[in-house]
Each structure stands twice: as C-alpha cells, then as structure tokens.
A protein has these predicted regions:
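Short loop/beta submotifs within extracellular cysteine-rich repeat domains
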Residues: 136-138, 298-301
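Solvent-exposed edge beta-strands and adjacent loop segments
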Residues: 1-68, 104-143, 151-222, 266-290
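Short, acidic/charged, Gly/Pro-enriched secondary-structure junctions
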Residues: 68-113, 228-268
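Charged, amphipathic alpha-helical segments and their flanking helix caps
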Residues: 1-4, 89-93, 100, 141-169, ...
Length: 303
C-alpha cells in the first residue's frame, strides 16, 4: 500500500450553499485530536508514577496557504464568531481535491480562532488559519465531497501596504515608507462551555472576545524621508503617534502607481493604538524599526 502524500491530505471549509471548498493554494495543514486529561492518582495508588484520566476530548486544525485573494471573506468569517462546518479527507492524485472517503476522514463544526495574513516585500503573500472544534467529529458520508479551488494568482507582498493617519478623525492616506514586512493577526478568545448537560466527552467552546493587531517593519532613512516628493510615514511620524497615545486610523490596501504608494482597493481598515515601537541597529546591516498596532474597536472589511 502506497504512503499518503501530504498534498493529498486536505482541509475543506463550508462555503456558499453549504458546499465544502478546499483551502486553495495550500502549503500545509494539521489536524490535532486531543484527550484532555486530569491526574488520577490518590493515596491508594502505590508508587510515584502518574496515572492520568481522560476527562474530555477536543480537536483543532490549521491550514497554511499562499492565497490571500479570500482575505476579505476570512476576515468577515472570523469577525462573525459563528461556527462553520469543516472536513478533512484524502484526495485523489488525479486532481488533489476529489474526496476518497478515507478511514480517517472526519467532519465537524469549528470556530475560526486565529487568522494571520502576511505581506512581505518580494515574497508571496500568505495566510495561516486556525480553527477550534465545537463538539464531536463524525465520519464522512459518500455524499460529502470537496469543491476544487478556483484558478487564483499569487499576490506579491510589495503590492499590499499599510496606510496610517495621524489621529482618529481623518482617513489614513500616508503609506508606511520603506516597509519590508507587514502582517495582521486576528484572534478569537474561546471559553469552555461544557456543562453537566453536555452529552458525550467532546468539549464545547464558545467565543468571548475578538482582538487583532498589525505589525510592520521598515527601514530607517538617515534623513527620515524617502524623497521630498513622497507622502509617507517615517520613524519620526511613528514616534509622534506613539507619544500621543491615542488611536489612529489605518487601512491595508492593494497598491499601484510609482513606488507602489497609491492605494487602490481597501482590504480591511479600522482604528488602532500604537502599542510598541522598536528601533533596531544591528552591526553591518540596515537599521530598521518595528511598529506594533493594537486594534481599537471593530475593523471594516472592504472599501
């Protein structure tokens, strides 16, 4: 019997109409099944060795992908804090998405618990999604199938940029100049809601809060600007925002034009506090700074 190759072990998420769609342009996935244990030793047990007892079961999954075209849909889904149906299965080697209904294939309900979007200079943009199961996993049926991925293009990180304002009253129109890296991380806090009324061993989780942060790293220019013609935020501007200690407006947008500084379609926007500003001066390397912004209130998806 041949060994299953990783490209033929895939995760699919419920989409429009209740159909399952594989995570497009996936580079890896992980499913974790966990027995939650409690120490069961007591004074009647002879010796010093532990004797754990299983008290509940839980599961989670993670998928990594080079596709960020669906960033808006994912940002909307995690913001809704509603569970979605997910499924994992072996897929056919002829197309890498037709389900084989393997013995280990399972489906269940899960919350989006973590989403990271990464847009780095001269790299393919990427995402990582994590989902936390709600209740049991069940075996898949013959009628459970995956829909194949759409034909999608890579998104280069240099064409997606962070724009900032100087306060929370005006639109963010100034790009972060000389940027090298940028990412957005969204997290949903989940709390154990399993009670004595819950049937079976599977843990029940419910969302309690949503938080997000944005991180960007940029080079420090010796004159603090790129050129006099560039409207961009430099390290001195970020220090002013830090000193003010009040929210500013931000947006992550696709860009075009000279030096990739003209915003076109907005992916996501909102307000944030500049939480930390770190300046780095390594020997024989370019000096840079990293700004971490903590989300203030809800974000908005799209323009």
């Amino acid at each position: 019997m041949a060994t299953l190759k990783g490209q033929n072990f895939r995760i699919a998420i419920e989409g429009t109409g209740g159909d399952f769609y594989v995570v497009a342009m996936s580079t890896g996935c992980t499913v974790t099944l966990n027995n939650n244990t409690e120490e069961g030793t007591h004074k009647d047990v002879v010796g010093l060795a532990n004797q754990p007892v299983v008290v509940s079961k839980s599961w989670s999954l993670q998928a990594d992908s080079l596709n960020v075209v669906d960033a808006g849909a994912l940002l909307t889904a995690i913001k809704s804090m509603e569970p979605l149906a997910v499924m994992f299965d072996e897929t056919s080697t002829t197309d890498n998405f037709s389900t084989e209904h393997a013995d280990f294939a399972r489906k269940g309900q899960a919350y989006f618990s973590d989403l990271t979007l990464t847009f780095n200079d001269r790299e393919n943009s990427a995402k990582t999604i994590q989902m936390t199961g709600v209740g049991p996993l069940s075996t898949v049926a013959i009628g459970d199938t995956f829909n194949g991925p759409a034909s999608l293009a890579y998104t280069k990180g240099q064409f997606v940029r962070l724009f900032l304002s100087s306060d929370n009253t005006v639109a963010p129109s100034s790009v972060v100049g000389a940027a090298k890296q940028m990412s957005m991380h969204v997290s949903v806090s989940l709390e154990d809601a399993t009670t004595k009324d819950t049937d079976g061993e599977w843990q029940i989780m419910e969302p309690t809060a949503l938080s997000y942060d944005i991180s960007t790293t940029a080079l420090i220019r010796s004159d603090d600007t790129i050129t006099s013609a560039v409207t961009a935020k430099g390290v001195a501007d970020l220090e002013t925002i830090y000193n003010n200690g009040t929210p500013v407006k931000w947006k992550i947008a696709n860009t075009s034009g000279a030096n990739n500084r003209t915003a076109s379609s907005t992916i996501v926007s909102g307000s944030a506090i500049l939480q930390t500003l770190t300046l780095n001066g390594p020997n024989r390397q370019n000096a840079d700074y990293t700004a971490n912004l903590l989300g203030f209130g809800a974000y908005s998806v799209g323009s």
